[in-house]
Amino acid sequence: MEHITSAKNPVVKAMRGLRDHKGRETAGRFLVEGEVMIREALKCGLTVRDALAEEDCIALAKELEGAGARAYTAPRSLLEAVSDTRTPQGICASFDLPAPLPLRDAPARIVALDGVQDPGNVGTIWRTADAAGFQGLLLGAGCADPLSPKVQRSAMGSGFRLPFMQTGDMPKALAQLHKRGWTVIASDLRGADFYSHPDPGVNFVLVIGSEARGISDATRQAADMLVKLPMRGGAESLNAAVAAGIMMYELMRKR
C-alpha cells in the first residue's frame, strides 16, 4: 500500500476537491469520512474508488482494497487537508455519486424539502425520515447538496439507505404526484392545526419549507392540505428539522 506524504499528490488534491459541489459533479464522486459511514456506504452497495488512511486505520483500508478501491496511507496532516472537519476520523474514501431516484419511481411515503438550505437540517430530516419509516426524500431547487459532507454527516448513513429524488420545479413535481394519487401535505404558518388534519391515505408527501421563508407561493397552491404545529408556549416557530420530525412520526403513528 503506497504511503503518501505530499499535499500536492494527485490523490490528495482529487479527494480535497470533493468537498465542494462543483468538484463532486466534475469527478462524479463524493467523500465519505470515518469507519462507521464508510462501512454503511459499502453495506448499501455504493462503489468505492480511493481511500486515504492513517496507520491505525490500515485494516479498514485493506478491506476497501478488497472491495476494489485504491488505498493509501498518509499522515494526519493530509487527512486534515482532505477532511471537511477539524478533527478527521482517521480514514476517508471517495465513492461514485449515487443516481437520484426518478420521480416516476416515487415511493409511497415521501418528505419533500422546498428550499431547505441548511445542510444540518437536510441531513437531520433525512435521518429522521429513515427512522420514522418514510421511504424517500424529494429535494427542490435551493436545497443543500444532498451529497455534501455536512449533509451526509448529519444523515448518519440514512443518506445511503433512503433514496432521494431531485426536482428543479417543486410545484410541478407535487402536481405530478397528486395526479398519480399522492396527497400533498405542506407545513405552512397559514395552515390548520396539524393534529386535526384528515387522514392523507396510503400515498402522501409531506412538504417542509425553507428556514427563513417557508414554502413558496406556488408550492402552497400545489398542496392538498396546509398544516402547522400549534405553538402553545412563547415560541413563534420551530426549527425545520424539529417540525419535520414531529410531523413525520405523527403521520406514521396513524399508519
Describe these PLM feature segments.
Residues 43, 98-191:
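RNA substrate-binding interface of SAM-dependent RNA methyltransferases
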Residues 1-58, 143-144:
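Boundary-proximal intrinsically disordered activation/regulatory segments immediately upstream
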Residues 3-6, 70-75, 163-170:
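Short acidic-hydrophobic, aromatic-tinged amphipathic segments that line or gate anion-handling sites
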Residues 34, 117-124, 238-243:
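Amphipathic alpha-helical repeat scaffolds
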Residues 74-75, 114, 140-141, 163, ...:
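Short beta->alpha connector loops at strand-helix junctions that form conserved
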Residues 93, 131-132, 146, 151-159, ...:
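Structured adenosyl-cofactor binding patch, chiefly the S-adenosyl-L-methionine
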